[in-house]
Amino acid sequence: LEKTHDFIRRSGSFNKSIKALKELRKNNISTSVITSINKENICELEELYQLLSDLGVNSWQLQIALPMGNFAKRPEWLIEPQDILSIIDFAYNKIGGKLLIVLADCIGYYSNKDIKVNENFLNDNWSWTGCGAGKHVIGILHNGDIVACTSIRDKTLVAGNIREKSLKSIWESPDSFKWNRNFDSSKLKGFCRECRYTERCLGGCSNSRYCING
C-alpha cells in the first residue's frame, strides 16, 4: 500500500496520511477517504479496506482515476470497462461492514448492486438522474473561479469568478453552465445513445465523458 500510494502521490505521503487519520480519530473527528482506482491499486482494495477499518475511518469513496492532470501521461494505468464490475461487486460485498462505502458518480448507475451500495451509504432511496454539475451543484476553486464541477478544469468552462461577480448572478446567468444545463440525449454517441436509460442517465459522469472522449 505504502509503495503504491507514495509512487502516485509523493514519497512519505502515505505515512503522513495515516498519522493524520489517527490524530483525527483521537480527537473524535469524523474522517472520509477517497481512492482513485487505477490498474496499479485495484488489486489492493481489500487490504486498504482493512487498514481504513482499523483506523476508524467513517466512509470511503471509490472513484475511477481519469486521464487528467499527471495521470493523463499514464494511459496504461486506466482501468478497463470490465474492471468497473469488480469494483461494484467489491463494494456490494462490504455492505454491513464497519466501513461505509460510496461509489462516485463515475461508477455504476443502474445495476442492482451499485444502487444498493449507494442506498446503504445514504440510508435512503437512490437513483442516478444524470450529472448535476451546474444544475444542482457548483464548485468554487482556490482562486475564486466558479465551475459546475471541481473535477472539470477546462478554463473555457469557468462561469465567472466570485471576486468579480456575486454567486447569485453567476448561477442565474443564462450563459452559465450551458454545456450541461442544455445537454440532452441527442448529443450522446456510441452505446450510450442506444442504452435504454439514455434519457434518464444522459451519459453518466460529465467529467468521465469529457476526459475519455473529449
Where are these regions (language model features)?
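Radical SAM/AdoMet-radical enzyme domain recognition
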Residues: 1-80
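Iron-sulfur cluster-binding electron-transfer modules in prokaryotic oxidoreductases
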Residues: 51-69, 91, 104-108, 113-114, ...
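Residues that line or immediately flank small-molecule/substrate-binding pockets and catalytic motifs
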Residues: 64, 199, 208
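C-terminal accessory region of radical SAM enzymes
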Residues: 82-119, 145-196, 202
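Short, basic/aromatic recognition patches
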Residues: 117-131
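Short, small/polar residue-rich loop motifs at catalytic or cofactor-binding pockets
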Residues: 131-135, 156
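Short, acidic, Ser/Thr-enriched surface-loop or helix-capping motifs
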Residues: 140-141
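Short cysteine/histidine-rich metal-coordination sites, predominantly Zn2+-binding motifs
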Residues: 208-214
